[in-house]
C-alpha cells in the first residue's frame, strides 16, 4: 500500500512543478506583451514584474486582466493564446495548492 505521506510529498512536487510552469508562461507572456502592446506592458509593470521592487498593485492588474478575459478583444493572436495558457495554468496551480492545503490538514488530523 502507498504511504499517505509519500503521496502527500508527490502532490507537493507536482504543485511546485506546475508553479514553475506557470511562472515560466507568465514570463513568456510578458515578453510577447512587450512587443505587441508596450502601453499595456508599462501599465502592468512588465519590466519590474519579477523583481523585488515590483509594484504588486500593477501586477494585480495583469492578474485581473487575464481573470476577466479582457484579452479576448486584443489584436494579437499570439498574445491571446499566451493569456489563455497562463489562465489555465493559474487555475490548475490554484487547485493543486488548495489540494495540498486540504491534504496537509487531513494528514495533521489523521496522523
UniProtKB/Swiss-Prot annotation:
It is found in: Cell inner membrane. The keyword Cytoplasm does not apply. InterPro entries: Universal_stress_protein_B (IPR019598). Keywords: Cell inner membrane, Cell membrane, Membrane, Transmembrane, Transmembrane helix. Pfam families: UspB. It comes from the Bacteria. The keyword DNA damage does not apply. It is a multi-pass membrane protein. GO terms for cellular component: plasma membrane. The chain crosses the membrane at residues 1-21, 90-110. Belongs to the universal stress protein B family. NCBIfam families: PRK04960.1 (NF003435). This is Universal stress protein B. It comes from Klebsiella pneumoniae subsp. pneumoniae (strain ATCC 700721 / MGH 78578).
Amino acid at each position: 500500500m502507498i504511504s499517505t505521506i509519500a503521496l502527500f510529498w508527490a502532490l507537493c512536487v507536482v504543485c511546485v512543478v506546475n508553479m514553475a510552469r506557470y511562472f515560466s508562461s507568465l514570463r513568456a507572456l510578458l515578453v510577447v506583451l512587450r512587443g505587441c502592446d508596450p502601453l499595456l506592458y508599462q501599465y502592468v509593470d512588465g519590466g519590474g514584474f519579477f523583481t523585488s521592487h515590483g509594484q504588486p498593485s500593477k501586477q494585480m492588474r495583469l492578474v485581473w486582466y487575464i481573470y476577466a478575459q479582457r484579452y479576448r478583444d486584443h489584436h494579437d493572436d499570439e498574445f491571446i493564446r499566451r493569456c489563455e495558457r497562463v489562465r489555465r495554468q493559474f487555475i490548475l496551480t490554484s487547485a493543486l495548492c488548495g489540494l495540498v492545503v486540504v491534504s496537509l490538514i487531513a494528514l495533521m488530523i489523521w496522523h
